[in-house]
């Protein structure tokens, strides 16, 4: 399936929830 969008957008290519498995993809933070 598709990645789940996290609760934030990216800020300068970084996600605040990266430690929870979220990564920056096309200005959105997605859980992979």
Curated annotation (Swiss-Prot):
This is a cyclic peptide. SUPFAM superfamilies: Cyclotides. Disulfide bonds join 6-22, 10-24, 15-29. Keywords: Disulfide bond, Knottin, Plant defense. The keyword Transcription does not apply. Coiled coil: none annotated. There is a cross-link at residues 1-32 (Cyclopeptide (Gly-Asn)). It comes from the Eukaryota. GO terms for biological process: defense response. Probably participates in a plant defense mechanism. The presence of a 'disulfide through disulfide knot' structurally defines this protein as a knottin. Belongs to the cyclotide family. Moebius subfamily. This is Cyclotide Hyfl-B. It comes from Hybanthus floribundus (Greenviolet). The lineage of its organism: Eukaryota, Viridiplantae, Streptophyta, Embryophyta, Tracheophyta.
């Amino acid at each position: 399936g598709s990645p789940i969008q996290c609760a934030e957008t990216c800020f300068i290519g970084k996600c605040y929830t990266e430690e929870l498995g979220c990564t920056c993809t096309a200005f959105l933070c997605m859980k992979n």
